[in-house]
């Protein structure tokens, strides 16, 4: 005769002798130890959900107003008041949309992707970077001239999403709240207003490839930067939640706008002699940009439709460049002074030197971007010798250092 079957816990398999009590269910038993374990697991899950909810509420509370966004941009970017205001409103509306969509019935809020138009070194990239840093969201940057359609040699447009994922350790939720800045967007314009019969791999074709990405699609991205293959599990990223900012110099676009405004007046834009007063009006001219102007320039209508917010930036003058050198929180002169301070040496730039640097940047037509190379060139030899110079107290950079490549004055 066989031994009577011993009653055991259906979860852990322990006998009644080992656990003391078993609670009977319809088709099985559970012991006190397993009940405690289940309770702990459920409690941990509840705690995690509560923490996530609290973090979400905390994040929502931290969404800065357009005034606060503008004030923060003022700390790091000189001038460009109109562009800052446009950006502040667009960014606020975008993140408000993400946080409020679940509570809006029968209304779908559109995306506020942004097009920045301004000359080299006017602050387009800095504005985008500063906003991402302020909002504490992932940021990625791409150069439109390196992008090609899928299947061609070059960088696939979806690689832009991969860069964003890399910058937030492949956390898709974080990536979907990020900002992507695509520079040199004016370099992928088509060469004529008529659709091309031949394939345009790096121009109109790239605009077409970017369309869905910018408007909103679910992109499949290989994990950890691998290549796509059929059996691979992909990361799915909803790009409708990502804010896209496109920037470009759009040289000559002002002529297109001027031609439209003064159509039939018989006065050619090229015939005008532009003085200082006219230069101010060029910024106002770019505020009047319409879709037809961008189409004439070479952007396709569908692409323009995905960038509803247009923010023009003005060219920086000498005064603005001097302010950029000295006033922002991370101003170039402050950075180099901090660097010299690590060697217990004071670094001084004379007002004449600052003006000379600004003039040189204007001559090179590099805007604020060219200032760092000018300062670096002026201080290279001094920085090379600095750790070896005992007793050095102060370094003075004057106008001669910038214009005549003289050595800075050393004070011991």
UniProtKB/Swiss-Prot annotation:
Q: Which CDD domains match?
A: RecA-like_ClpX
Which positions does UniProt annotate for ATP binding? 119-126
> Which keywords describe this protein according to UniProt?
ATP-binding, Chaperone, Metal-binding, Nucleotide-binding, Zinc
Q: Which PROSITE patterns match?
A: CLPX_ZB
Please give an example of a GO cellular component term from this record: HslUV protease complex
Q: Domain named ClpX-type ZB: which ranges?
A: 1-50
Entry keyword Glycoprotein: no
- The domain of life for this entry's organism is Bacteria
One GO term under biological process is: cell division
Q: Which SUPFAM superfamilies match?
A: Glucocorticoid receptor-like (DNA-binding domain), P-loop containing nucleoside triphosphate hydrolases
| GO terms for MF | ATP binding; ATP hydrolysis activity; ATP-dependent protein folding chaperone; protein dimerization activity; unfolded protein binding; zinc ion binding
Q: Which residues bind Zn(2+)?
A: 9, 12, 31, 34
Its subunit composition reads: Component of the ClpX-ClpP complex. Forms a hexameric ring that, in the presence of ATP, binds to fourteen ClpP subunits assembled into a disk-like structure with a central cavity, resembling the structure of eukaryotic proteasomes.
Task: Please give the family membership noted in the entry.
Answer: Belongs to the ClpX chaperone family.
State the protein's purpose.
ATP-dependent specificity component of the Clp protease. It directs the protease to specific substrates. Can perform chaperone functions in the absence of ClpP.
Q: What is this protein called?
A: ATP-dependent Clp protease ATP-binding subunit ClpX
Q: Which organism is it from?
A: Mannheimia succiniciproducens (strain KCTC 0769BP / MBEL55E)
Q: What is the name of the gene encoding this protein?
A: clpX
